[in-house]
Every structure is written in C-alpha cells, then in structure tokens.
Regions:
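Residues at alpha-helix caps and immediate loop-helix transition turns in enzyme cores, especially N-
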Residues: 14-17, 98, 134
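Acyltransferase
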Residues: 129-144
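Pocket-forming structural segment of enzyme catalytic cores
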Residues: 49-132
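A short, terminal or domain-edge coil/loop segment
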Residues: 32-42, 88-94, 140-142
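Structural motif
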Residues: 3-5
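Cysteine-nucleophile active-site neighborhood
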Residues: 7-73
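Alpha-helical elements of Rossmann-like donor-binding domains used by nucleotide-donor carbohydrate transfer enzymes
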Residues: 20-24, 101, 136
Length: 144
C-alpha cells in the first residue's frame, strides 16, 4: 500500500515532482494498488484521476469539524453517521473524478472523503493527527 500525506504546495502546482507523482498515482490506479491520500494526498489523487482542486472561497479551514458519511456507502452501511476530522487546508477538491464515490462531506468541506473502486481511499482531514498533536502544531505555527 502507498500513502500520500500533506504538503505546503498545491496539487495544481506545475512542479516536476508533482507531475511525476500524478503519473505514479495513475499507474497505481491502473494496477489496482492500494493507495491512501490525506489532505494534499487527497487533492493530488483527485487531480491525477480527472477531478479538480481549487483554493477554497472561504479561505483556510482549520479546526475540528463534523463530517457526515453518505448513506449506502459500501464501507459504512446504510445509515448516515457523523465523525470528527481535524482540518488544515486552503485548497479543496471541487470536482471529484468520474469513477470515484463521495463517502463523506462536511459544512466546511464538501468533499471530505472519497473512494475509488476498492483500492483508493482519501480524506481531506488529517486522520493521522490527534487533538494534542494538532494543538502543538498550531502553537508552533505549523498549522493554518
């Protein structure tokens, strides 16, 4: 499995390493390799596979916000459920790739979680952060 996490650059930046990583994502997808994306990784997967990422009109989204799992998702059953995610982003997915499934959204982030077939899963929120870690990052100026 592969994991792509956060970055200070944008998924739509025209940098050589981003272009190369998007090509790698397409190759992983073609070969049905497991891939998880978090924040920048979520956005980069969407961009690489035909979605769109833009700067959020509302600006930075920083904090803990409830996301709602969509009904009838293969992963989570038939009931809508809420869960909290820690967000720290100013870019967001505005159009999902054609073959993806929207799994969760929130008031502040319409595309909070995506799946593509059974091998790609991505989150806009930082599932790798706990609250104490996020507070520490905020205090030293690494968030927002």
């Amino acid at each position: 499995a592969y994991l792509i996490t956060g970055s200070k650059v944008s998924a739509y930046d025209d940098l050589p390493w981003i272009i190369e990583l998007k090509n790698f994502i397409r190759t992983l997808h073609q070969h049905q390799k497991k891939l998880v994306g978090i924040c920048f990784g979520h956005q980069l997967i969407a961009e690489a596979l035909g979605g769109t990422v833009e700067r959020a009109k509302e600006g930075w989204n920083v904090g803990i916000h409830a996301a709602t799992l969509k009904k009838n998702t293969v992963l989570f059953g038939s009931a809508e459920q809420e869960f909290n995610l820690i967000y720290n982003h100013q870019d967001q997915v505005t159009k999902i790739p054609q073959e993806s499934k929207l799994l969760a959204s929130s008031r502040t982030c319409p595309v909070a979680m995506l799946a593509i077939e059974n091998h790609i899963l991505s989150f806009q929120g930082h599932i790798e952060f706990d609250v104490a870690y996020a507070k520490d990052l905020l205090q030293i100026g690494l968030l927002g």
